[in-house]
Structures are given as structure tokens and as C-alpha cells.
């Protein structure tokens, strides 16, 4: 406006941006609802632990330990939702059924849902409190959203994330998973330390810096 550009087109563009974002959010909410989770459950400040698991090295006892810890955490924290988009691999689904039973519906605050497309998953991750995962990529993505990541592996190929404090290793040890998730849910200082740690993968301003670079050329 200060440059003499008429205000109306700018405001029209701004309104379009808001409307576009609202439409995308509505679409993602609808996809999540069809997959088995109603995101509006979080409207009153309810917390969410997002879970993923698929690593081959965790098949067998590792997944049993993970699922047992998740089951006990969901019982311990009735005011927290636990959402697990299940990988299609039978080696992942079998231990889930062994621990939670054949019927995965009606488990209170535990929601096993079908796999999500990337945008819906990122949307769900943005609404989460903690991410509990054995994924490599999520260790890079979640810190950009300010989400602490507990990695259910004994090692990580993202040592920079470990060093910066955005991720912690818990392995598939029942007690470590229980203790670390409980600490982040109960201890605000511990949560803030992880969620506000410096993201080793950038501050989200790369696009702005690139634009500024070319503008100043």
C-alpha cells in the first residue's frame, strides 16, 4: 500500500489465502475422519501423541514392547489421545493385534487408523504434542513444527538432531518409552527444552532468504 499499490487487490488476495488455507484444513480433517480420527477432539486443549512404526529391525519382540508401552500409556493418560496410522506390513499389524486384540475400535483414547497421505500426516503432526516413531524422515520434519520426537530405535542416522536435543532415543525398551513419554506429558520444562531446541535442519526461512538474495542482485 505504501508503494501506491491499490489496497483492494491485496486484501482480495489475502482473503483468498485465508479461504484457501481453511479449505485445505477442512479437506484434511475430512480425510482424517474417514481414516478413523476426529481432529476436533483436540479443540479443548486435549493432547495428542502421534505414533508411527515400520522398521524391520523392530519386528517381533521390539514391536510387542512398543505396543505394550503404548497400551499402558493410553491407560495412564486418559486425557491424552494416542493416534497410530498403521503401516500395511503384516509384521507391523500382527503385534498390534496381539497386544490390543482383534477389534481395534472402541479403545477409548487409542486410535488405530489407516495410513495417511503426506499432507494429511503433516497436518496431524502439526496438531500433535509428541511424536513417537522409528522413522528417519520424521526426525527431520517434526522439529520444524516444534514437536519433540522420541525415536524407538537404538541408533539414528540423524546425529545432528540428537546433538541438538530435538530427538531422544528410547529404543524398544518398555520402561524407556514409558518414562520418556510420561516426562514430556508431565514436565513442562522438559517439554519446552525439546520443543524449543534449535532445529539443526533450518529455521524455516530459507525461501525468504532466497527471494531476498535475488531481489538484491
PLM feature segments, named:
Residues 83, 111-113, 130-132, 150, ...:
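Hydrophobic/aromatic beta-strand patches that form the interior of the parallel beta-sheet core
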Residues 19-127:
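Donor-nucleotide binding loops and adjacent catalytic segments primarily
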Residues 115-117, 154-157, 173-174:
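Short, acidic/turn-prone active-site loops that include or flank metal/cofactor-
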Residues 1-9:
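Single conserved hydrophobic/aromatic residue that forms the stacking wall/gate
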Residues 122-162:
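A donor-sugar binding/catalytic signature common to diverse glycosyltransferases
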Residues 8, 18, 53, 180, ...:
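Amphipathic alpha-helical segments at domain termini/boundaries
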Residues 23-29, 168-217:
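Leloir-type glycosyltransferase catalytic cores
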